[in-house]
């Protein structure tokens, strides 16, 4: 956007709003994808603390947790949303007076205060690949980030993204003009922000700054200057770190409501402003059909990333993302061996930790984890990330299905606060050891495989998988025994380790277990099926001897929290069969 210094951007309306108001130099969406990001906004809570971090998880909330518009309605506000919701939690009251394409503040009672959200989808990921497209910006003029290869598809998609952001700006201009025609400009506080980073691969879905950073512009008319952030100045900027988790408490504060204790953000405006936070946090978990687990923190300059699934590459095949031409072209060039190290990083296994200097390296391609001069910063941010996970009782350390099974009769949030149901420290310690590298921890990993808690056993198996051939061979007996563990998630990881790294007989054992657990029926668990299918896909030709069974796997029909799970399972089965040269119902 032009107001953020991009010389190619054509965003005159938001630029003008920034000149009249103030922009935050660094704002994060908390999650680099829509549903968990919007869950953060609507609750004022970090989704990993309530079990809502996975796409379309639809978890229940504790009774006292309400969507923030419900608080505004109690204050007399007419609350409208036009029209996207896409939250990862279920509730009987979304808080809105109206939420639809027709919802509008003009429908309020005369003189009634209003709170209105207008969503624009014209710059959505799907619009980057819409063809035909009337070009405005010349693809030759765009700056290709250091992590992307410089090819025609990348340039075309980046140029088209600039064009559709200009359309989003035009829609913002229409809404501001509409407000002005209603005589409400000097009566109304305005926020403008994005959903998450761009829809390009390594933007949306990935918790680098390119996926988390969003524009955040606020305008306070003179009438309401007393409610503005303390540093507010027309045409100014703020170095305060603003996260989507801060929006709900801020909006309540603007309405004169003290944010409830269960909200985890910090109000940056209104009558209950709080001091600037030292850090901002982000996360990545299951993105559509693909599992991952990443936590991040920034102090505004340095960005620390902790990968809890380093045994998965960044660029796992997400069907929806690979429809975009630049994504497929990027993978094509990687397979051809034409990329440099920075451009190849996305398609390789992750390191356990990453540290980037956002000022010196805005594209985040120079990992400073091994830099002696950055050792103190690394330790500080590592501790901040660990402290945050403890503070919020991060539920990401449980396999997704266990979030649901352990919270039967209650909610994931309440379960997560109960040490009897979620012994956090034991599980967190097991995950920390599992996702490091080196053989020294192997005795502890084997011990964890025999632990009473299934999540500790799960991380024991992950730790062996993460360490590869040698650890798998040294733990062969324990892994074979784990194929019969009462936890299906332990079985999946043990089977994947054997399937990837063991001798032929044990490879076949692993494949048999994964094929069995992939079978999603009305009596089975969709989360187990998805975990098993993800693992099966990573075995490629090793699973070919069970091709006919894989072709017959059901693509839906079992219970799930959301209708999109049918598509997730279909995508996973389809990708596995495609790699084996087949398709559902078609013999190889």
Identify the function of each model-found stretch.
Residues 359:
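C-terminal helical cap and adjacent loop that interface with cofactors, partners, or active-site loops
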Residues 23, 213, 338-352, 368-588:
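Long, internal low-complexity/basic segments
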Residues 355-356:
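Short hydrophobic beta-strand that contains or immediately precedes a catalytic carboxylate
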């Amino acid at each position: 956007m032009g107001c953020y210094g991009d010389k190619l951007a054509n965003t005159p309306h938001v630029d003008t709003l920034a000149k009249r108001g103030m922009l935050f130099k660094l704002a994060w969406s908390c999650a680099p994808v829509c549903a968990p990001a919007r869950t953060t906004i609507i609750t004022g809570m970090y989704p990993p603390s309530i079990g809502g971090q996975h796409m379309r998880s639809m978890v229940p909330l504790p009774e006292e947790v309400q969507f923030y518009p419900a608080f505004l309605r109690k204050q007399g506000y007419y609350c409208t949303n036009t029209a996207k919701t896409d939250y990862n939690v279920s509730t009987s009251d979304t808080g809105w007076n109206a939420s639809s394409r027709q919802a509008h503040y003009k429908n309020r009672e005369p003189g009634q205060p209003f709170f209105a959200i207008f969503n624009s989808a014209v710059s959505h990921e799907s619009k980057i690949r819409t063809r035909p497209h009337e070009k405005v910006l010349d693809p030759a003029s765009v700056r290709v980030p250091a992590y992307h290869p410089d090819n025609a598809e990348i340039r075309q998609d980046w140029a088209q993204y600039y064009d559709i952001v200009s359309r989003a700006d035009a829609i913002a201009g229409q809404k501001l003009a509409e407000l002005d025609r209603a005589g409400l400009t000097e009566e109304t506080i305005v926020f403008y922000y994005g959903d998450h980073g761009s829809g390009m691969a390594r933007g949306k879905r990935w918790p680098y700054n390119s996926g988390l950073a969003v524009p955040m512009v606020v305008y306070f008319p003179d009438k309401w200057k007393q409610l503005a952030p303390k540093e507010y100045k027309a045409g100014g900027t703020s170095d305060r770190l603003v996260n989507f988790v801060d929006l709900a408490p801020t909006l309540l504060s603007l309405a004169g409501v003290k944010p409830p204790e269960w909200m985890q953000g910090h109000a940056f405006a209104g009558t209950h402003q709080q001091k600037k936070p030292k850090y901002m946090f982000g996360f990545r978990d299951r993105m559509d059909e693909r599992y991952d687990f990443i936590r991040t923190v920034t102090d505004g300059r340095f960005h620390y990333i902790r990968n809890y699934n380093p045994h998965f590459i960044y660029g796992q095949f997400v069907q929806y993302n690979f429809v975009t031409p630049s994504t497929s072209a990027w993978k094509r060039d990687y397979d051809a061996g034409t990329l440099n190290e920075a451009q190849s990083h996305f398609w390789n296994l992750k390191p356990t930790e990453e540290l980037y200097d956002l000022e010196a390296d805005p594209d985040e391609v120079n990992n400073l984890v091994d830099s002696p001069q950055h050792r103190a910063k690394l330790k500080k941010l590592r501790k901040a990330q660990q402290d945050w996970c403890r503070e919020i009782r991060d539920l990401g350390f449980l396999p997704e299905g266990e979030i649901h099974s352990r919270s039967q009769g209650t909610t994931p949030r309440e379960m997560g606060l109960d040490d009897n149901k979620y012994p956090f420290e034991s599980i967190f310690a097991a995950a920390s050891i599992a996702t490091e590298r080196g053989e020294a921890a192997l005795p502890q990993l084997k011990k964890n495989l025999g632990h009473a808690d299934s999540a500790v056993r799960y991380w024991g198996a992950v730790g062996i998988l993460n360490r590869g051939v040698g650890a798998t061979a040294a733990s062969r007996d324990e892994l074979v025994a784990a194929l019969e563990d009462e936890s299906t998630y332990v079985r999946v990881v043990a089977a994947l380790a054997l399937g990837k790294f063991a001798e032929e007989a044990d490879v076949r054992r692993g494949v048999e277990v994964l094929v069995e657990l992939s079978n999603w029926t009305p009596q089975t668990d969709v989360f187990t099926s998805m975990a098993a299918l993800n693992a099966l896909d990573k075995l490629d030709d090793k699973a070919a001897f069970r091709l006919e069974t894989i072709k017959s796997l059901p693509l839906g029909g079992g219970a799930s929290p959301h209708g999109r799970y049918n598509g997730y399972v279909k995508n996973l089965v389809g990708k596995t069969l495609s790699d084996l040269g087949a398709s559902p119902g078609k013999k190889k």
